[in-house]
């Protein structure tokens, strides 16, 4: 008899498992009396309850990352006319998907992938990496702010189906006589571009705002600006290296004076500078190692 793959079994079970978030934070996006900074501070405070302290690391360390996430939280972004709920992993602060007012969950990924969300989610048709969302552009090209978040929420809340390139071409063929020429032009376009643009704004403002002190401060400073706000080129590069900065924090915990070349390229010379930039550190221990440590502690009465 073939042995079952525990990870695969867990993933399959997750498909039918209803997520119970540890908390839900509501942000009234258009309320100018409710600062973005207060929203981020409140979510961070709740996330930190599930973090641990690590000797030599100034920042709270997130729970160990697992193949099948166990800890989740929701953020409900509400405008005057609509709302969406973001499902975010506690172990790495990744946005996995969002729920519309109609109760439909949209998840990053495509047919053939394994769902992490319950309640019969639908695939967005693309992944959640920055490469998937903005291609080779830098994060300094992403405009954010209260108005941008409002538009993103209102537009995403209306999403009812995944627009595919084929669907776009068929619609044009039915509506316009010069369809052949237009369809050829459409083939070079991305019918999901607008959805991706809205989602990347929310990913940076919410997820990166939680991870990075620099991001939350920058966004907060220009959140009410009519022209929006953007990150600097350096901040954008740091955001895309959050995992590596987290690894460096663990390295500096063991070797405080270590010189880490790739951190110097990001303008981060030591753990003090890293703590100024990063608010929450990704756990660098594997789930297996964490389980082994826990088992060892359970079997040893002298363990603290």
From Swiss-Prot:
One of its GO terms (cellular component) is cytoplasm. It comes from the Eukaryota. Accumulates to high levels in seeds. Keywords: Cytoplasm, Hydrolase, Plant defense, Protein synthesis inhibitor, Toxin. It holds the Pfam family RIP. It is an enzyme of class 3 (hydrolase). Disulfide bonds: none annotated. Belongs to the ribosome-inactivating protein family. Type 1 RIP subfamily. Monomer. Possesses features of some constitutive defense agent. The coordinate Opaque-2-controlled synthesis of this protein and the major seed storage proteins (zeins) may provide the germinating seedling with both nutritional benefits and protection against pathogen invasion of the surrounding endosperm. This is Ribosome-inactivating protein 9. It comes from Zea mays (Maize).
